[in-house]
């Protein structure tokens, strides 16, 4: 019997948190993992840690530097994968930022206390909002565009966009944006851009306008709502690829200063499940809240 050909996965933001654990779980299942991160030192250390822990070979997991907000960096990774592996089976867009400044002491002191308003511990700036959109929305979009040709060479291609329940349309206060992003039939990338540009224009004029967009973390909410909308567009455009977004749950990570409820193992299990589902059993164009299909 012919040996099964290896399956290859890229995980962005793989040096820590949920991304690191996704890499661990995939490698443990025999998937060959390309762990990526902006920070080369941290990425290389993460790969060495996993090789020792899982007792796997140099071929089982490799590191490649990646900044999803930099087109040159994305192209460099695509060339690397094409040259060394010839195809891609799984793309997990996990890299992301919160887009806010957090008063960590106040957050830790208040977490779990009755009447605590965590939104009062954070501050949004235009610069952070812009970076958040670049990384959380345009980053995955750029990755998908670069890797679809390599995914099309797989017999079981899938894209998993790690999103958030905060990106559900119901969390938008702006009715105009809500209308555009919930209109599945007429969704286009241009319309998503219009929503994003309007948010950034509003924040550039006055950061207080954030309250017209979401109750809290407006750039983060819009970036994830945009990512969910793009997931639907991509699934329709490429029926041969299983494309889904997933909220891993409120996980203890560096992004929320370990105030989450779930462990990274629990959080990573949801994107990993979607990555490994048999092709014929895998839905496409869905938003998952952990392991359950939910509304966009």
Curated annotation (Swiss-Prot):
SUPFAM superfamilies: NAD(P)-binding Rossmann-fold domains. Transmembrane segments: none annotated. GO terms for molecular function: alcohol dehydrogenase (NADP+) activity. The keyword Zinc does not apply. The keyword Transport does not apply. Its EC number is 1.1.1.-. Substrate binds at residue 164. Disulfide bonds: none annotated. One of its GO terms (cellular component) is cytosol. Coiled coil: none annotated. Pfam families: adh_short, adh_short_C2. The active site is at residue 220. Belongs to the short-chain dehydrogenases/reductases (SDR) family. Aldehyde reductase that catalyzes the reduction of the aldehyde carbonyl groups on saturated and alpha,beta-unsaturated aldehydes with more than 5 carbons. This is Short-chain dehydrogenase/reductase 2b. It comes from Arabidopsis thaliana.
């Amino acid at each position: 019997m012919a040996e099964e050909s290896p399956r290859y996965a890229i995980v962005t933001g793989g040096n820590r948190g949920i991304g690191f654990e996704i890499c661990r779980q995939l490698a443990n299942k025999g998937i060959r993992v390309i762990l990526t991160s902006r920070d080369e030192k941290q990425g290389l250390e993460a790969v060495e840690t996993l090789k020792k822990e899982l007792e796997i070979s140099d071929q089982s997991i490799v590191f490649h530097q990646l900044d999803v907000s930099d087109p040159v960096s994305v192209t460099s990774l695509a060339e690397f994968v094409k040259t060394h592996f010839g195809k891609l089976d799984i793309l997990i867009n996990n890299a992301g930022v919160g887009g806010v400044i957090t008063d960590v002491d106040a957050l830790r002191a208040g977490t779990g206390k009755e009447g605590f308003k965590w939104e009062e511990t954070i501050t949004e700036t235009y610069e952070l909002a812009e970076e958040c959109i670049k990384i959380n929305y345009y980053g995955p979009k750029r990755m998908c565009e670069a890797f679809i040709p390599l995914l099309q060479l797989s017999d079981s291609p899938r894209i998993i966009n790690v999103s958030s329940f905060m990106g559900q349309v119901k969390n938008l206060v702006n009715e105009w944006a809500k209308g555009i992003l919930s209109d599945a039939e007429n969704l286009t990338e241009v319309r998503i851009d219009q929503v994003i540009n309007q948010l950034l224009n509003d924040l550039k004029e006055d950061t207080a306008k954030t309250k017209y967009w979401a109750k809290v973390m407006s750039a983060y909410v819009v970036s994830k709502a945009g990512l969910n909308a793009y997931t639907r567009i991509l699934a329709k455009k490429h029926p041969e690829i299983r494309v889904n977004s997933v909220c891993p749950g409120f996980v203890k990570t560096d992004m929320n200063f370990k105030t989450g409820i779930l462990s990274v193992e629990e959080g990573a299990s949801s994107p990993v499940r979607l990555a490994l589902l048999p092709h014929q059993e895998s839905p496409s164009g869905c938003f998952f809240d952990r392991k359950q299909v939910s509304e966009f």
